[in-house]
Amino acid sequence: MIKEGKFTAHYECENCKKPIPHSKKRWMVERCEDRPTAVAQVPGLIGFHVWAAYSYSPAADWSILVREYKEALEALRKGDPEPMQTFRNTVLGEGWEDSQAGKVSADNLAKRRQSAELGNGYSILGEDFTLTGVPNGVLLITAGVDTQGGGGTANERLVATVWGWGVGEEGWHLGHWDIDGDPQDKNTLAQLDRIAETKWVREDGTVLRLARGGIDEGGDATSCQAVREFCSTRKDVWVPVRGAPQKGKPLLGRGVPVSINRKNKPIVKNGVNLYFVGYDESVKSLQYRLGVETVGSGYLHFGLCSTDQFLAELFPWRRMPRRSRGQISYHWEAPTGARDEGGDCTRYAYAALQLVTRRYTPGTMWAQLARSLGTQAPGTGGGGGGANRFGTGGRFG
């Protein structure tokens, strides 16, 4: 119940159904009887499950527990399972089964892949970098790039993925590539120009180009410098990004002006802006998006480029508990040895989409984009007929 803006709660007697106020809790607990309801699996050893409602702690006031449950339930409906997981673990004393885990598994996502048996009919190595068959629902294209290694380390490369976006942030995976070479080498980074120069042709003939792309600037000074220098001459498309591991950080922070050489002096006037991508928020957002199973707003389509390996990398993270000063919190962690390049690239591509949205009036962006293309914004029905054959990928460099 809610009274005068505050939660009140009572216990309902299982026999007479009459309400018992919280003020009677101590009286109830002192007169309770513990009765076994199951046969002991180990002879002579019994146990009882007692949850927080029996506690005398002020924090276990029934009204507080009701409020916490309602808040956790509301968060769960919005795609955030952490409050409910905490409530189930610490208040009810029960285990937590993440209902989203099955939805985001590689096997389940592979079932959504459209016409994979048709093969990869396109190559980004074509002379004019033209790719056809992009669904009509796509109004905007962004990219995310992850840096792997550098400075002569093993398996050094760039990993890039491209997503198309439409009304309601419905998304289509359009391309995924491994670009061999040292990410600290400007010649390796220059391979990204191929993606920026690509003409993405929709089924209705409308031509799109990459609107924005986020490049992970890596973890060392040399990689940061290389990425920032690359972006400084391509600021209309590429921006450097970096993960923000602290909880509570927004999915995409405000741009922070940074130097792009070791002398702390910008090579070009105003330098470049670095954007921090909130790790917790972006992973949580991706989990929610992958859990959307109805085509339309928020749904993510997978095409020919969405290989089994990419889908395995798309969401390897699991929510793991950590205890600090007696409090339990949950953090996203990938199992040891698990690859997450596909997920990182997708998080950066989605952050690039959020960067683009800052240019537009809220609620009118998709209509404005459609008008700029000379078309009408389609409904959220999957992007038009024949949109089942799309996407490209591979390795180059």
Locations of regions flagged by a protein language model:
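Cys/His-rich microdomains that often coordinate metals
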Residues: 1, 19-22
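Short His-Asn-centered micro-motif
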Residues: 145-147, 211-219, 241-242
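Short cysteine-rich clusters marking metal-coordination/redox-active sites
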Residues: 13-16
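A contiguous, basic/glycine-rich beta-loop/short-helix subdomain that forms a polymer-engagement track
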Residues: 22-144
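Short, intrinsically disordered, charge-biased short linear motifs at domain edges
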Residues: 1-6, 330-333
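Nucleic-acid-processing active sites and adjacent nucleic-acid-binding tracks
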Residues: 92-140, 147-212, 389-397
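C-terminal nuclease/phosphodiesterase catalytic domains that cleave nucleic-acid phosphodiester bonds
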Residues: 26-27, 91, 218-386, 392
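Short metal-coordination and nucleic-acid-contact micro-motifs, chiefly zinc-binding Cys/His arrays
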Residues: 6-9, 341
